[in-house]
């Protein structure tokens, strides 16, 4: 969406982050989901603590915001797996990689139902 031409005032018309959610939450979810195998409940609890206090340096997110973007993350993560199954090699940054030729093994027809059901119980 950032490739859509800017409006007359030079402002970006559409931002990906507005559609998929805050990148800092997605980064938090993907790291702990992949690196530690945390369940939605554990991800929610950890995010709640990490993004709870408005006095901290991280942006504050309410419980409802965290739940909403956790659902979006899980739905999109599982729905987009087929794209990762045919990707060329890419760089590995840190201790987590989504390269199908490296660390990550996941069927391209996996379903997010179990994970989304757990999100609904939060």
Residue ranges and their predicted role:
Residues 1-122:
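ATP/NTP-dependent adenylation/nucleotidyl-transfer catalytic domains that generate, transfer
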């Amino acid at each position: 969406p950032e490739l859509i031409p800017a409006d007359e005032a030079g402002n970006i018309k559409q931002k990906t982050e507005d559609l998929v959610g805050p990148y800092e939450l997605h980064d938090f979810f993907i790291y702990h989901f992949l690196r530690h195998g945390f369940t939605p409940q554990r991800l929610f609890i950890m995010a709640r603590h990490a993004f709870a206090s408005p006095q901290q340096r991280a942006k504050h997110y309410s419980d409802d915001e965290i739940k909403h973007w956790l659902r979006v993350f899980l739905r999109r993560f599982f729905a987009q797996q087929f794209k990762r199954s045919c990707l060329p090699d890419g760089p590995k940054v840190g201790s987590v990689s989504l390269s199908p030729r490296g660390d990550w093994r996941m069927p391209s027809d996996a379903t997010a139902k179990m994970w989304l059901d757990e999100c609904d119980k939060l």
